[in-house]
A protein has these predicted regions:
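A short beta-strand submotif of the Rossmann-like class I SAM-dependent methyltransferase core
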Residues: 88-94
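A short glycine-rich, Lys/Arg-flanked "PGG" loop and its adjoining helix->strand segment in the class I
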Residues: 103-117
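Adenine-nucleotide cofactor-binding loop residues
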Residues: 75, 95, 126
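Acceptor-substrate binding/catalytic loop of class I
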Residues: 143-160
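Substrate-binding/catalytic lobe of Class I Rossmann-like enzymes that use SAM or dcSAM, i.e.
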Residues: 162-170
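Short N-terminal helix/helix-N-cap motif within the alpha/beta-hydrolase-1
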Residues: 99-103, 130
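Conserved class I S-adenosyl-L-methionine
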Residues: 120-141
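Conserved N-terminal segment of class I S-adenosyl-L-methionine
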Residues: 1-84, 88, 102-105, 122, ...
Length: 207
């Protein structure tokens, strides 16, 4: 198990959701060791959080942080999960790893209760670190971590993420870009070049 990945700080997700809560009960899909759920609870954004995590060791760690954890692949957990209990479903850097993220978004939509919110974050393949090597050198190289992580099966831009989510029945309510602080100091490049400077894109949708 990559301990760094499974225990990573998710303050970025907390910051995005801070102005959209509070929520009663969240479901964190791909919850890793449960750190995000713990952070959301401590920040007062959710009252409680459940998780789905396929990796046994990570699921065991998450069980100590979350109310309930299913050690299952998402496809196997679909029928076991009490979807109507959740007013927030989280897919934080998960879609890019799934074989069929489109069907996953549809399955969750069909099972979620009316008014439930879906939070999605994905790496932004429009980032300059990907675009410039591709444009000027024809390079599209996979690496061990980051936007071009070799475990990523799919790639999204802010615009394609929105279209993907909306096409599966969700109504997008909020969007944001994760831009490094050094770029946020200047209004002009931040506003004009945001899609090229953001390492991640965030989205909140409603059923």
């Amino acid at each position: 198990m990559n301990g760094r990945y499974y225990t990573a700080d998710r303050g970025d997700v907390v910051d995005f959701l801070r102005s959209h809560g509070p929520f009663n009960l969240a479901l964190d899909i791909g919850c890793a060791a449960g750190r995000l759920g713990k952070q959301l609870r401590e920040a007062g954004i959710v009252n409680s959080c459940d998780g789905i995590e396929p990796h046994p060791a990570a699921a065991g760690m998450a069980a100590g942080q979350l109310r309930r954890v299913w050690n299952r692949d998402l496809a196997d957990a679909l029928s076991e999960t009490p979807w109507l209990d959740y007013d927030l479903v989280i897919l934080a850097d998960v879609l890019e790893h799934l074989v069929d993220p489109w069907q996953t978004l549809r399955d969750i939509h069909d099972r979620a209760r009316p008014g439930a919110r879906l939070m999605v974050s994905v790496p932004n393949v429009r980032h300059k670190s990907v675009v410039f090597p591709l444009l000027f050198h024809g390079r599209f190289d996979y690496v061990d971590a980051g936007i071009m992580d070799r475990t990523h099966l799919h790639f999204f831009t802010p615009a394609s993420l929105r279209r993907t989510v909306e096409a599966r029945g969700w109504k997008v309510r909020a969007e944001s870009l994760n831009i490094k602080k050094k770029y946020r100091k200047w209004w002009f490049p931040h506003r004009l070049l945001g899609p090229f400077l953001a390492v991640q894109c965030f989205l909140l949708a409603e059923k």
